[in-house]
């Protein structure tokens, strides 16, 4: 057997022994472009026992077959470690995956790299699931046991987090960013608690205080009557069905399909549960959620037996409350839609009674089946732990073969660079830095783009914004403008178009500075003077005009031209400016029916300002006949708004009237 160093065309290198042109014995091989490293024993071109190190620092140490991980081995990826069997590159059949930072772990059977068969999953807060699995999800029969409510992990995301489950990382070991970013959302639930009923009397009043609440305006009169006459305990029972919401368990926080499990209307409100209370669910699971028949029971006496759908009470069932009262019937998304409630006259419906009884029997059978599956899962877990211990021995043997291969490589080629140890050192250094400076590892929220409109005031131009194209912008003439009493029709039309494009915030600016705060013209008036002004360049001349720093480059006259008052009135009637549209319609067109004198006072104050703003802008009587459509829009706009407001007011008064009568 000979040996040496061989460089591949793709940038990889093999340094070690070979036989008949194939790697044989001990050696080190790097991947394309020198990325990744395998060191260990070889047999006719294939890895046998050794370790592979990725550039990210993730490692595998164990047995190989036909170039794939096969047999027993240990994989370290990110904050997780898998110890157990491997089959053609995938995890399986028995193995244990555990977190390096929390108690989270899975022990059981695997298939194609996912949990499949029977197993036990322990979550970051100590809660457990024991039962059947399929395709990496809880599927079949199983038991979900929570820890005391005070110790349960607060899950703040509909996505799974690495604290709560095992399926929280990508293939390269990096944690999903969505799970970290969603920690800022207000949705907070306790792991393993789905029977979250808001039993507080004040919350009951708050829940039922809305105008359009269920049962107030168009609902049943009996519900309102029972609420007014019953005690606090009956209020609690009456609101349990309406306000109860589904809470995802801690295991549900990382499933790729566990979206929409939380009703955001009640997320910020926490139930008043004793810190020592625990909850257990025994029954059917489908696609990682409670689906089918099952029983959910709390240690304080609360219990539900019946049908489930997507972690919610859905179908027929019976709920027993801690005080001994109960409600039974048909549920739909945690709401009792048909059945028997406390303090209400029982519905004499034998079919409903029979369906409830059948649902309870089905739930009890499912719970019994789940308990038998738990026993099988525990036996599979014991076997998986034994395989994990054997995998540790295989990893130890792989490390020994790795050391031999490194010694052989150094002997054959002293200058050969072995990247594996550097990958591991870099990963360890990153871990130390993360512990010393945890605040640096917190991903900062991406800044809002600079072009976001809320970074600037209204009426101002963001810095760095491109200049308007000549097609839609007008620059003043190169020659210095002189004060003139007469204007040609084209300039008058351009100024009138300027008035129409004034923004809403210009009204205040014109009143205060009528000569220097003119807003930029809009594209509506650009077409009027396009042929005359589009090809000219802007020549600043501070002697005759003042350039407004907040708008585009155009001049505003320092001396307002004098016009007869008749022209201003005619122009006001023909082409109203935006300031006139802002101040006049509300007092003139519509006023509240109860107060008549106040709008008159506002009208008398608003007209001088509007006229003053109009007089501050040059006008041209020649353009009065050019905008009848603007006049119609100004007259029709406030009318439609007034009609809508009056209709809404009438509807609101009618609803209040009916509400008080009922």
UniProtKB/Swiss-Prot annotation:
Bilayer-spanning residue ranges: 641-661
Function: Junctophilins contribute to the formation of junctional membrane complexes (JMCs) which link the plasma membrane with the endoplasmic or sarcoplasmic reticulum in excitable cells. Provides a structural foundation for functional cross-talk between the cell surface and intracellular calcium release channels. JPH1 contributes to the construction of the skeletal muscle triad by linking the t-tubule (transverse-tubule) and SR (sarcoplasmic reticulum) membranes.
GO cellular component: a single term: junctional sarcoplasmic reticulum membrane
Modified residues (Phosphothreonine): 448, 461
Notes on the domains: The MORN (membrane occupation and recognition nexus) repeats contribute to the plasma membrane binding, possibly by interacting with phospholipids.
GO molecular function, a single term: structural constituent of muscle
Species this chain originates from: Oryctolagus cuniculus
PANTHER family assigned to the protein according to its UniProt record, in alphabetical order: GH28348P (PTHR23085), JUNCTOPHILIN-1 (PTHR23085:SF6)
Similarity comment: family membership: Belongs to the junctophilin family.
Protein name (record): Junctophilin-1
The keyword ATP-binding appears for this protein: no
PTM-bearing positions, type Phosphoserine: 157, 216, 220, 452, 465, 469, 475
Cytoplasmic compartment residues: 1-640
Transmembrane listed as a keyword: yes
Keywords: Cell membrane, Endoplasmic reticulum, Membrane, Phosphoprotein, Repeat, Sarcoplasmic reticulum, Transmembrane, Transmembrane helix
SMART domains per the UniProt record, alphabetical: MORN
Compartment(s) where it occurs, according to its Swiss-Prot or TrEMBL record: Cell membrane; Endoplasmic reticulum membrane; Sarcoplasmic reticulum membrane
Biased composition (Low complexity): 584-599
Biased composition annotated in UniProt, kind: Basic and acidic residues: 432-443, 600-614
Biological process, per Gene Ontology: muscle organ development
Region (Disordered): 228-247, 432-634
MORN repeat ranges, renumbered to this chain: 14-36, 38-59, 60-82, 106-128, 129-151, 281-303, 304-326
Membrane topology, from the record: Peripheral membrane protein; Single-pass type IV membrane protein
Highest taxon, organism lineage: Eukaryota
